[in-house]
Amino acid sequence: MKTLKIIVISTIVLVMTAGLCGCTTFDNFKAAFIDKNQDSGREVIIGVLEPVTGSESKNAEDEIRGIQLANSVHPNAGDYRVSLVFSDNKSDIDATETAAQTLIAKEPAIILGSYGSVYSLSASPFIRDAKIPAISITNTNPLVTRNNKYYYRVCYVDSNQGDLLGRYVVEGKKEKKAGVLLPEGDDAAQAMAAAFGRRLRSETDNDDAIAFYEQYKTGQKDFTKELNRIKRTGVKSILLPGEYADAANIITQAAKLNMDVEFLGDTTWSDGSFRKLLGDNVTSEDYSFVQFFSSEGELTSQAITKERELFLSAYQKEYGKGSEPSDAMALGYDAYVIAADAIGRTTGKPDAKKVAAVLADPGYQIEGATGLINFNSIGDPIKTAYITKWKNRKTETVYTLDAQE
């Protein structure tokens, strides 16, 4: 028995000595052999609910890339290593319910996604019942956050974009009147127009601040009558919500008439496909649009955050300096940054309940890649926004709107 003890002790000493040969200090040895086992329990799950496959998978790619890029920059949340756990909703409503339940069973501290408001709405009851906070990335349907106190978003809804463009007309352009040209029967366009009008009337104290308001049929080809009516009003800014194909057609026809008017649109105009639809006679002075992120242009100090620099550096390293990050990628990045930050602000072992409490705090605020971000009581963001134009095949910010309630 004594001989056996000697053999065991000798073996332990031999193993420790061998390990120490590769470690210059005891701290290195401790990190290599002791802390490794302890760290395996210091892991926190951030769930990702996205259409990895199916018809929407291509559209969701930038959201996912943004999340993954942020994870590479910030692999830890406080003292815990983040484990990204994906659940594929397969671009299907029924599959989303299963994917959400599967993800919830993993007990994530927070969930990110999904691309497509319809999928987030399908997952919402399960997320609400599990009391797990979630952050949608590009969902513009107001019901995503309105019907679930645990759901947040990092993008503006359509009506918010109308409000932002109203601020731009008054603050940036110093104008007191504007017009609206929108498609019939488009609820999102109507919500955007209503918010635009409210902002102008409020800021100018003028009930007649919307001097032109007219509707057209989606897919309409000739806008000569509408454009001539706009000319007669003398307004210099026209809100143009709706499909960007119609918007591009209207802007092109207005340019042919040499109209001294700037058309204002939503974030869909940042898509390169919109730029390609514009006629050769259209200049950057003919239109502006809202963007959630800007890599260059007229930026305020609120927009130039440390996280923005980290994001751009990581993006350029991964995708090259010649390319430009999309809004969706920057928003996906920020959704992860908020999740990791909220986890890091908890005490003790993080869980969904603690993270939900952090995000529900009215004083919660963070500087993300897209600027300053906090949330209102519904879970929608109060954040920096950018008024942008296409210049030399790239988007360039011409006016920054600081976060405002």
Where are these regions (language model features)?
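Extracellular/periplasmic bilobed ligand-binding domains
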Residues: 127, 193-293
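Beta-alpha junction/loop-to-helix N-cap segments that form part of ligand/metal-binding clefts
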Residues: 25-34, 43, 58-65, 73-144, ...
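Extracytoplasmic "Venus flytrap"
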Residues: 32-66, 74, 87-93, 116, ...
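Short beta-strand elements at the ligand-binding edges of bilobed clamshell
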Residues: 88, 143-168, 213-215, 281-293
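An alpha-beta-alpha
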Residues: 151-218, 236-237, 339
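Periplasmic-binding protein-like
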Residues: 48, 103-116, 135-137, 179-183, ...
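Segments of small-molecule ligand-sensing domains
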Residues: 315-330, 340-394
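Extracellular/periplasmic periplasmic-binding protein-like sensory domains
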Residues: 255-331, 390, 394-403
